[in-house]
Amino acid sequence: MSSSTSTIVAIASAAGTGGVGIVRLSGPQSRQIAVQLGVARLQPRHAHYARFRDAQGAVIDDGIALWFNAPHSFTGEDVVELQGHGSPVLLRQLVARCIELGARQARAGEFSERAFLNGKLDLAQAEAIADVIAAGDLRAARAARRALDGVFSRRVDAVAHTLTRLRIHVEAAIDFADEPLDTLGGNQVRDGLTQARTLLAQLLRDAERGRTLRDGLHAVLIGPPNAGKSSLLNALAGSERAIVTDVAGTTRDTLHEAIQLDGFELTLVDTAGLRDGGDAIEREGMRRARAELERADLALVVLDARDPQAARAAIGDAIDAVPRQLWIHNKCDLLSDAAPLDVNAIAVSAVTGQGLEQLHIRLRELALGDGVESVDGEFSARTRHVEALRRAERHVDAADLELGFEQLELAAEELRLAHEALGEITGKISADDLLGKIFSSFCIGK
């Protein structure tokens, strides 16, 4: 963790050359260092032109200096931004001069870490800074911006507040153990549990959507040989990415292809067909296919529409652990009109394009839910947020079960654990190693 007694410095603008480059200082010596660099006047929140000089008085660069006095700054400390020409050579020289004058090189994410430690933003908001920077399209950028504005954090806090009220009622009932729960606000507890479960379910749904907007979806094409998996990948990608032949077992290795679909990135993984037997190379391909399924968010189960039941047998239980599955009957252009089709499957033809539009719609629904946004709009989220919400949901369910048996101490503990899981999202309950891991993934100047 950083120490606010030190003053840190780093280049805050993007790597490479540009019209403008920024060096950022934060800490108690920031203003003093700026003055020693040659900034004659510094008023809070005013821009001042200056020539930045080295130890011998030679001009390093000229530009603008801005001072944000504590606590009215991003980090909550005294912050000075030096804006000069975007030459990496000059920016590095300016940083070196700041270090000579008493600053030290900032670690990755240390400015955001100090903002978190000084209460300027919570952990989910700090992570959203990196998400805004890394957003690949406008929809993801807007979702990250909402998370940075606190939309996600406020909803987490709303659930946490509900759990706090519940814990007060339950722990009060423990102090009066001789009284039945119903005489001690039992109905309020049950109503509160219902409210907490509803809020958590809605928040988890929206967080899963936010994670997809941020990270995309990892979808594995799985099925027996010659079902048309490679042809379907090519059709979805809009290019001939995979080799296609009539020979079963053509695909031996995995092939990854990322496509943009309605505002999120879908990574398609073509895999070897699953069947009994095959040579050593094909068996290795099938092993890799099963390994991909262990990491998959979505299994696209591709079967030959002419005999889907026989094809299902080849897959067995390989997809059981995948949270989301979509069954696709390919080669539907070869079916007669009277041929039966599983009502739970989508009929497509990778060759003619039949059914691909419906497949796109279904993929979007699986990735982003029903498409109904919350009143606050979409926000970005991360895998750790989703996992924490799932833990909270499990503990609330367990608390409900324990209350049914009037096991108040156990119910109170489950509610405490649910509250703790929510606290991990915003950083109100976080281990130092978790904070270090999160902030170390940031840019140096953030």
UniProtKB/Swiss-Prot annotation:
Annotated Mg(2+) binding sites: 230, 251
Xref: SUPFAM superfamilies: P-loop containing nucleoside triphosphate hydrolases
Binding positions for GTP per the UniProt entry: 226-231, 245-251, 270-273
Disulfide topology: none
Keyword Nucleotide-binding set for record: yes
Main location as per UniProt: cytoplasm
Binding site for K(+): 226, 245, 247, 250
List of residues binding (6S)-5-formyl-5,6,7,8-tetrahydrofolate: 24, 81, 120, 446
Subcellular location: Cytoplasm
E.C. code: 3.6.-.-
GO CC entries: cytosol
Co-factor remark: Binds 1 potassium ion per subunit.
Claim: Transferase is one of the keywords in the record: no
Cofactor(s) required, per the database record: K(+)
Pfam families named in the record: MMR_HSR1, MnmE_helical, TrmE_N
Keywords: Cytoplasm, GTP-binding, Hydrolase, Magnesium, Metal-binding, Nucleotide-binding, Potassium, tRNA processing
Gene Ontology MF, one: metal ion binding
PROSITE patterns in the cross-refs: G_TRME
Gene Ontology BP, a term: tRNA methylation
Similarity remark: Belongs to the TRAFAC class TrmE-Era-EngA-EngB-Septin-like GTPase superfamily. TrmE GTPase family.
Protein's job: Exhibits a very high intrinsic GTPase hydrolysis rate. Involved in the addition of a carboxymethylaminomethyl (cmnm) group at the wobble position (U34) of certain tRNAs, forming tRNA-cmnm(5)s(2)U34.
NCBIfam families membership: mnmE_trmE_thdF, PRK05291.1-3, small_GTP
HAMAP family in the record: GTPase_MnmE
Assembly notes: Homodimer. Heterotetramer of two MnmE and two MnmG subunits.
UniProt-recorded name of the protein: tRNA modification GTPase MnmE
Protein's organism: Xanthomonas oryzae pv. oryzae (strain KACC10331 / KXO85)
Gene responsible for this protein: mnmE
